[in-house]
Amino acid sequence: MAKTKYEVTYIIKPDIDEDSKKALIDRFDKVVTDNGAEELESKDWGKRRFAYEIEKYREGTYHIMTFVAENSEPVDEFGRLSRIDNQILRSMTVKLDK
């Protein structure tokens, strides 16, 4: 089966402390790798100002993950858990060209 490269960008609430943010990022990195993702690259883009308010916040901490997977299981599980977690304001997943 062909492997697909994915890029997941998500925004964390700006008022979360540094230790909690690191734990959140580590937890979601683990969720993705536990569900079959390989070659995980996880980067912090830092705090950025929004063009409009999201849930009464004017800024947020951006984080991006890039990984390869044989199926959509890591993406589906990340999406499910990120919608439940109230520390994540938004997320977006993109399928990248090879």
From Swiss-Prot:
Any single GO CC term annotated in Swiss-Prot or TrEMBL for this entry: ribonucleoprotein complex
SUPFAM superfamilies linked to this entry: Ribosomal protein S6 (SSF54995)
Keyword annotations: Ribonucleoprotein, Ribosomal protein, RNA-binding, rRNA-binding
InterPro entries: Ribosomal_bS6, Ribosomal_bS6_sf, Ribosomal_S6_plastid/chlpt, Transl_elong_EF1B/ribsomal_bS6
An annotated GO BP: translation
GO molecular function list: small ribosomal subunit rRNA binding; structural constituent of ribosome
PANTHER family: MITOCHONDRIAL 28S RIBOSOMAL PROTEIN S6, SMALL RIBOSOMAL SUBUNIT PROTEIN BS6M
Protein family per UniProt: Belongs to the bacterial ribosomal protein bS6 family.
HAMAP family the record matches: Ribosomal_bS6
Function text: Binds together with bS18 to 16S ribosomal RNA.
Name recorded for this polypeptide: Small ribosomal subunit protein bS6
Gene name per UniProt: rpsF
